[in-house]
């Protein structure tokens, strides 16, 4: 409430004080005017907003292509990543012996925060499991290497995902090739002709052979 001030001229003046807010703590209470009050006290509802800047779609595609090139090069030249994909390579074994790992696709989020790397692994089940597990274990290492190779304000988080589409496609192609080969071999086989039977029929004596017909 405003305070009432009396003067000698019998005029009244109202002294207005800004509303005072009190915040209690474990030790003492703090008093401050409304302009200095926390946001959650000045408004009934405190709203937390997260602002994300979306990059240009063209730039997103360019970043995805560059990441795909860098990762493909790392699979060929980086020994740390090669040994993670195929541990036998560290012992001197052929790194193409049990599995072959390739980067099939790369997707970058619109805010350039996350990159999904789709990996195709050709080989037996054990080789696939080892390769995918090795790549996932080196996700932070790959992110740091990408930060060194690429000029980005923020290096995106790397997530490796197994891509089974190419393997399924190769299986379908193999099945179609097998069917085509079987069909071609079936058409190449000639059916036994009846020419030999016809020859045998001609060799049989004709009962009317010795009969002379007179007109």
Swiss-Prot record:
Look up the domain of life of the source.
Eukaryota
Keyword field: Chloroplast, Plastid, rRNA processing, Transit peptide
Please give the InterPro entries that the UniProt record associates with this protein: KH_dom-like_a/b, RbfA, RbfA_dom_sf, Ribosome-bd_factorA_CS
User: Has keyword rRNA processing?
Assistant: yes
Biological process terms from the Gene Ontology for this record are: ribosome biogenesis; rRNA processing
User: Where is the region Disordered?
Assistant: 183-210
* Main localization category: plastid
Ranges of Acidic residues composition bias in the record: 194-210
Annotated family: Belongs to the RbfA family.
Which NCBIfam families does this chain map to?
rbfA
Protein name, as recorded: Probable ribosome-binding factor A, chloroplastic
């Amino acid at each position: 409430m405003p305070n009432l001030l009396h003067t000698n001229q019998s005029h009244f003046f109202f002294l207005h004080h800004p509303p005072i807010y009190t915040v209690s703590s474990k030790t003492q209470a703090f008093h401050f005017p409304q302009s200095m009050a926390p946001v959650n006290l000045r408004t009934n509802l405190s709203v937390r907003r997260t602002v994300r800047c979306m990059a240009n779609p063209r730039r997103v595609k360019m970043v995805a292509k560059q990441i795909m090139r860098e990762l493909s090069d790392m699979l060929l030249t980086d020994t740390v990543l090669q040994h993670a994909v195929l541990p036998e390579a560290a012992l001197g074994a052929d790194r193409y012996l049990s599995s072959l790992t390739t980067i099939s696709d790369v997707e970058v989020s619109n805010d350039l925060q996350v990159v999904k790397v789709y990996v195709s692994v050709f080989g037996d089940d054990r080789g696939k499991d080892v390769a995918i597990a090795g790549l996932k274990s080196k996700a932070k290492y790959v992110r740091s290497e990408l930060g060194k190779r690429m000029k980005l304000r923020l290096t995106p988080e790397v997530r490796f995902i197994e891509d089974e589409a190419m393997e399924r496609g190769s299986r379908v192609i193999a099945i179609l090739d097998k069917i085509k080969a079987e069909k071609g071999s079936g058409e190449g086989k000639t059916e036994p002709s009846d020419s030999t039977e016809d020859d045998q029929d001609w060799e049989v004596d004709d009962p009317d052979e010795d009969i002379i017909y007179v007109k």
